[in-house]
Amino acid sequence: MKVLSIDFGTKRVGLAISDPDQIFAFPYKVMERTTRDAMFSELLEIIENEKVGDIVIGLPLSLDGEDTLTTRQVRNFAASLERRVDLPIHLVDERLSSIAAEDELKEAGLWDRKRKKNLDSQAAKIILETWLARA
């Protein structure tokens, strides 16, 4: 089964997905945050359509490993999602994933506007690659 990775942000939610063998990670899409219900509805549809078996969520710890306000928001989001799906949810340290994502997009030659549009799904891909390497 596939693994869905989520980079949860205040404005956008980046998604990445693995292949069924859980070897490769691919950027999937960027969801604009609207209402909480709309966000969960779209996520549940993706989970069902893509036959997702595990969910990985990036946990934004501070550089010294401490929880921040955003960390608590992500933990609340993960708990809300856990109540809606019967799948394992894994929290993965995402420190510096956005910086690594931006570097990858620059290396791919994407110009600024296109890079910004794809940054969140690329960060989700890096989070997923981290999890797949450990699994």
Curated annotation (Swiss-Prot):
One of its GO terms (cellular component) is cytosol. This is Putative pre-16S rRNA nuclease. It is an enzyme of class 3 (hydrolase). Its EC number is 3.1.-.-. It is found in: Cytoplasm. Keywords: Cytoplasm, Hydrolase, Nuclease, Ribosome biogenesis. GO terms for molecular function: nuclease activity. It comes from the Bacteria. PANTHER family: POLYNUCLEOTIDYL TRANSFERASE, RIBONUCLEASE H-LIKE SUPERFAMILY PROTEIN (PTHR33317:SF4). The keyword Transport does not apply. Pfam families: RuvX. InterPro entries: RNaseH-like_sf, YqgF, YqgF/RNaseH-like_dom, YqgF/RNaseH-like_dom_sf. GO terms for biological process: rRNA 5'-end processing. Could be a nuclease involved in processing of the 5'-end of pre-16S rRNA. Belongs to the YqgF nuclease family. HAMAP family: Nuclease_YqgF (MF_00651).
